[in-house]
Structures are given as structure tokens and as C-alpha cells.
């Protein structure tokens, strides 16, 4: 039996068009119908602004809200929705020394840093590193949502740094440099051949799940999670039931309770149906 379902957004709940598709809506509706008390928690690397939009859309699908908690920035912030407004429950900002060291390394290797500021208003992103890539990112993508880094941004606090490289070979090299530089002091995750993400040591989805469970007096044995990438590993280790999407890293699949075998628009709904048919009302140990 489960009381909570933790969901990643990109590559999991959201389709390739960044929406909740009809098969997923139907499967989720059937799951909630089978257990009306079931709650959903969203856990994502996105910003609070982007995450909240999807939380609101998800809640609007049902007669009563199903999402009370969500974490964003890869677990650096946790929110609880009260009176239809998100209330911050914790946050982890990177130490200034970590930020400055990261920016220095990335600039040397001609990569681009996209740092997420602890801010509720735009601009909430700052750019550092390769100036040409930064210019294209600002003027063709984020526009008013981002600015170029200055020392005052350290006072605001930085929740997460996304690092981009055009060269996969260089990205792999810098990933190893960052891992060796920081050791276990921060989370350094390789998301793709061109993307690295850096967060505070305690800023992960596993911590978010555990924190929420203690706050709501829920057992981790009654929680299931679904994800598809490295930043889902921590929550897979915490929850009793974990389900990996078909294109997940092999190490994530190894620790998963089950894995989707679909790569089409049914890849997420297949896992929801599996949960509905097996563990949704199964007796807890």
C-alpha cells in the first residue's frame, strides 16, 4: 500500500512536448479513483516558477488538490502548498567558495554556467563562463529572466548551477575535475554528454522525500517514486518502491523495483497502471 507517489517532471510525468499527455492523465485519474487519499509530490530540477505551473495544472485535473508538496532546483528547495500558495519549508544554497571555484573552472574550459538565484522575481538566473554562449543564451532564450554574474549575486544565494559544454569530450573532462575538486562536499551530477549540475551536498530529492515524510508522519515504506535520471537516484534509495523510465541510466534501473519497457507516449502511463494493479492497495509490511 502506498500513501504518496513522488514524480519527476522532465522525462517522466511530462511528455516530449513538456505536457501531461492524455494516457498519463487517464492513468493518474484511475490511480486516484482507486485510492482517493493518495497524494502526489513533484520532485524536479526546474525552478520554482516553472514547477509551480505544472503543479497547478496537475491539481486542476482533480476535484481536490493532489499535490501538497513539491521540491525544485534538484532538491535545494522544498515547498508546501497552503491556502493555494507555496510556503518554503527548507532551502540549501551553495557556499560562495564553491560558486566562485566552479565559475573559475568552467571559464577556463570555455563552458557556460547557468546559476539559479534564490529569488522570487526576475531575473532569477545569472550567467558566467563563456561570454559568447552566455550572450546567445540571454538574448535568444532566457532574455529578461537572466543577467550576467556579478559579486552581488553571492549575497542573494545560489541554489543550483547548470554547466553546459558544446563538446561532450570537454564536458566529461570537466566533470572529473569538478568531482576531484569538491569530493563529497557538493553534488556533482552528469545529466548528459553536454550537461553537468551542481547543488549543495544535502540538496537532493532523497532528502526532500525524507523531510516531507517526517513532517507528515508518513512511512517511507508507503511511498513510491518514478524518475528517469541521475538526480532521481537519491529518492530511489529512500522510497520502498521505485520505478525507472525506459531511458534511465543503467545504475538507476539496477536499484528500481521495476522499469518501463515503453519508449512511446505510454512510457509513463504504463508504470502508473503497474502501480495501480500491484502495490496501490497492497498490504504494507
Swiss-Prot record:
EC numbers for this chain: 3.1.3.-
Stored InterPro entries: Cof (IPR000150), HAD-like_sf (IPR036412), HAD_sf (IPR023214)
Keyword terms, alphabetized: Hydrolase, Magnesium, Metal-binding
Domain of life: Bacteria
GTP-binding recorded as keyword: no
Transmembrane segments: none
Cellular component GO terms held in the UniProt record: cytosol
Family named by the database record: Belongs to the HAD-like hydrolase superfamily. Cof family.
Protein name stated in the entry: Putative phosphatase MG125
Organism classification: Bacteria, Bacillati, Mycoplasmatota, Mycoplasmoidales, Mycoplasmoidaceae
